[in-house]
Amino acid sequence: MQFIVQGYPAFAYTGGVAFDAKLPVVVMVHGAAMDHSVWQWQSRYLAHHGYAVLAVDLPAHGRSPGLARERIEELGSWIVGLLDAGGIEQAALVGHSMGSLAVLQAAIAAPQRVRRLALVACAVPMAVSDAFLAAAKEAPPVAFDMEAVWGHAKNSQLASSPVPGATLLGATRALNGRSRNGVLEADLRACNAWRPAQEALKSVAVPTLVVCGRRDVMTPPRAGKALAAAIPGAKLVMLESGHSMMVEAPRETLAALRDFLAG
């Protein structure tokens, strides 16, 4: 499905079901150098079980043209712009990694537009190492390898996959390797720079879910626990996975989201 957001086309996958804004809307936002397909397991299920799903491609990602945003504040504004473009008064926002920061920023800036908030593999702050930033700028293929390896628990790197014949590590490397020039660096710098005040986190008043991977080395469990403690009333779910839990533990991730969205 196509929208015009801030003057540019924006693509959103609807889970194989025609989008109906009269249903409860769920907006799903991917991480750095990724696209809507990271939500393939969860988005399709939700779309076939009573939700209007928009798994988006952020600007300069996937099927959405334009320039990559260099600040999380800009990504949060883009998400609100998507709601405006779709005539959506209020939605549940679900984000992974960089996408979790974007939806959190949207909830801070425009709380009246957010019904529920799910933060998957989130850390605040989301510090990025100098080596990773340098590789993204000077040697993107090396940075893509870093993201793929660090983004999965060790067992997922041994050809383990819920899909027979597939390798999660290879699929992630193929996906991030398709990203446009400079996008990974812009995404990582946006993550690294975002430092909201504790008061901003405490101001989040919508029902919030924080989903962590026990084996996540990019946004480790201690960061998820701290975030859940900082947001009033937030619920914490810990999965036996790494950073890419939507594909490493797709059923468990879906179950956590499904139960939370049902409220």
Predicted features along the sequence, with ranges:
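Active-site glycine-rich loops that stabilize anionic/oxyanionic intermediates
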Residues: G31-M34, S97
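Short beta-strand/loop motif that positions the catalytic acidic residue
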Residues: V204, V210-C212
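Active-site loop/oxyanion-hole signature of alpha/beta-hydrolase fold enzymes
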Residues: F3-G16, Q40-H48, A52-M98, A255-R258
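Flexible "cap/lid" loop of the alpha/beta hydrolase fold
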Residues: L101-M146
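Acidic catalytic loop of the alpha/beta-hydrolase fold
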Residues: R215-T219
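Conserved alpha/beta-hydrolase catalytic His-Asp/Glu region
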Residues: A127, A134-S203
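Catalytic histidine-centered segment of alpha/beta-hydrolase-like enzymes
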Residues: S241-L254
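Short beta-strand element of the alpha/beta-hydrolase
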Residues: K22-G31
